């Protein structure tokens, strides 16, 4: 996954995990390639979901959220140089969610937020408080279990707001356009034939 600029050099980076739980940082070289990988952690195979929300605690550095199968959610704050500050627990019971999406600032308050889908297809927004925790949460959609994949699309339509993508059971790629207030102003199919992919980022 991409945490954004994780080492503070102004270039986007990539973090990968191997089969034994080793975590590695591939720093972007700014020209479409990578600098040599370096190890930044071990034991990360205890997590079933690892995502890069951006700067979740408001210190100017990009961070990582990781969930254990038992539902505990942890914040690993980045130190701005490709390493970590001490982790903090930011939630329990997150194992009821089968998709975690990091769209950035979804409600327009300047803080990073999180979207989560449960097994019944309900989609929730968890608004960040800008200090490594949550301000509130509420449901913003139903029927999202009809989608095989859900993810953050960035600003897909150029209106300055973060959007969300989904792939349905027929393989259609759908874009859901944010209204900037933790809601939607429309959706449309923007592609087909995406059903055979095993992962979409």
Predicted regions and their residues:
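Trp/Gly-enriched beta-strand/coil motifs that build multi-repeat beta-propeller-like domains
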Residues: 1-201
């Amino acid at each position: 996954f991409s945490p954004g600029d994780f080492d503070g050099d102004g270039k986007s980076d990539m973090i990968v995990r191997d089969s034994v739980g080793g975590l590695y940082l591939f720093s972007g070289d700014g020209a479409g390639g990578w600098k040599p990988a370096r190890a930044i952690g071990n034991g990360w195979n205890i997590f079933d979901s690892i995502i890069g929300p951006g700067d979740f605690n408001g210190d100017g550095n990009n961070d990582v959220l990781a969930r254990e199968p038992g539902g505990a959610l942890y914040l690993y704050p980045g130190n701005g140089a490709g390493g970590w500050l001490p982790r903090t627990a930011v939630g329990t019971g997150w194992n009821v969610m089968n998709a975690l999406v990091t769209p950035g600032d979804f409600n327009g308050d300047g803080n990073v937020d999180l979207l989560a889908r449960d097994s019944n297809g309900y989609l929730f927004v968890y608004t960040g408080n800008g200090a490594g925790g949550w301000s509130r949460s509420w449901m913003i959609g139903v029927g999202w279990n009809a989608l095989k994949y859900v993810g953050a699309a960035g600003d897909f339509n150029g209106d300055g707001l973060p959007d969300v993508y989904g792939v349905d059971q027929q393989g259609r790629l759908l874009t859901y356009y944010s209204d900037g207030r933790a809601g939607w102003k429309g959706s449309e199919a923007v592609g087909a034939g995406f059903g055979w992919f095993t992962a979409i980022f």
